[in-house]
Amino acid sequence: MRLPRIVVAGAGMAGLVTAVAAQESGAEVVLLEKGPAPGGSLALSGGTLWCARTVDDLRRLVPRGDVELGRVLVEDFPAGVEWLVALGVSLAPLKTLPDRTVYLMEPGPGAFITHMAERFQSGGGTLLCNSAATELLWSDEGEVSGVCVRINGEARQSIACDRVILTTGGFQANPEMLSRYFGRWSDRLILRSNPRSTGDGWQMAQALNAAPSRAMGSFYGHLLPAPPAQVPTHDFIAYTQYHSEQGVLVNLRGERFTDESLGDETNTQAVARQPEALAVLLYDDTVYRTYAVRLAGGGARASDTFYESQALGAPAAVACSLEELAAAMQAHDLHGSSLLATLREYNQAVQDQRTAGLVIPRRANPNPVSKPPFYALGVTPGITFTLGGLRINTDGQVLDRGGYPIPGLYAAGADAGGIHNERYAGGLCLGLVFGRRAAKHAASH
């Protein structure tokens, strides 16, 4: 009996997992990587692998995500972690919170990438770098029969196969698609991931009438210091404003526009919809010392996210009074009088314990901006990966616009969308769980 031949397009987290899992399931596997080496956006991450602890936890964290895909994500995650450990991957339990379980790749994502790539190749797999999948081939029998590949940006060749699994990493580096789904200010988004994630999987699948998932207008990312600051691509984590949920965000009019306590990834999407995709993050000395100054840990270096961002050139001010802070930020095109009124109204609501009743409610973390000195930092969205993509079923099969599986076509990782929507509960877990599921189904059907 001939072994099934599977082509996996993209060698990031999802692609590496998929390729090794398909190989273990008895398939002959070719793994394509658009760049010069495997890794994708995983290589730029901190290597944190996490997921919601229970299905109920996931529903609270991501209430608008796909229910059935979310259930599979949570239920399969522990087995995926056990599988990685059995392969020899070093995962350290980083912390266990009431609603999530977190692991850290040790000594970092680079070791994971090397280990998985070597495991794949030593098992007889073919890894082709500088090889971008550009087109899916379709047989007379009505199923995927191969893929066209551009090698080194020039030569093209076709690879015949029985199944194709798309793991190209989303479309966050595709300006046209960002404009289509994220609107007027999408060109201001700072790419904090793989620059080769240009929606290749999405575009190839559209030729086969593939359906879009939900969440096409959502992305996962974090706030970064605003221009003229330019964050070094190797050091995104040190400058990321994870603590925005502890502060107050205002737009250039000096007005709040979102419930900051929903989380930095939600704040990032909200800022992307504001004029110029710019906002100012405000907090007092208590928040600065507790959250803005970070110790080394979780794969990241120690950093002072305010002063290091200011040193890069981001609009910023420190003052001993709110009046002085508002006046200082006027030099950065912020409406100072509106900012002052916003902060006074907010502080009064905190004092009266009625922040949930503000025009823009604040439901958690009602930290007052009351202890000097006070800090203001211009911020802008950084995009890591898109939450929308191809619609899949629980086996990772790509569905057409009628809701039927496209024979021979699968997707995992950021190419498969709708699992998260607006909010987020782990990124690498998507590649782990649905990469394994797609591999198993593709190798056995």
Task: Explain the meaning of each model-derived region.
Residues E135, S338-I419:
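A glycine-rich dinucleotide-binding beta-alpha-beta segment and adjacent secondary-structure elements
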Residues P4-L31:
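N-terminal Rossmann-like FAD-binding beta1-loop-alpha1 element of flavoenzymes
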Residues A27, K34-T126, S131-E135, L249-V250, ...:
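Conserved N-terminal/central alpha/beta ligand/cofactor-binding core
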Residues M204-A211, G431-H445:
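Internal hydrophobic alpha-helix adjacent to the cofactor/substrate pocket in enzyme cavities
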Residues I159-P228, L428:
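Glycine-rich loop(s) and the adjacent beta-strand/alpha-helix scaffold that form part
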Residues R2-P4, G153-R163:
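Core beta-strand elements of the Rossmann-like FAD/NAD(P) dinucleotide-binding domain
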Residues G12-M13, P36-A37, L343:
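Residue-level detector of alpha-helix initiation sites
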Residues W202-M204, A211-L334:
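An anion/pyrophosphate-binding glycine-rich loop and adjacent beta-alpha core
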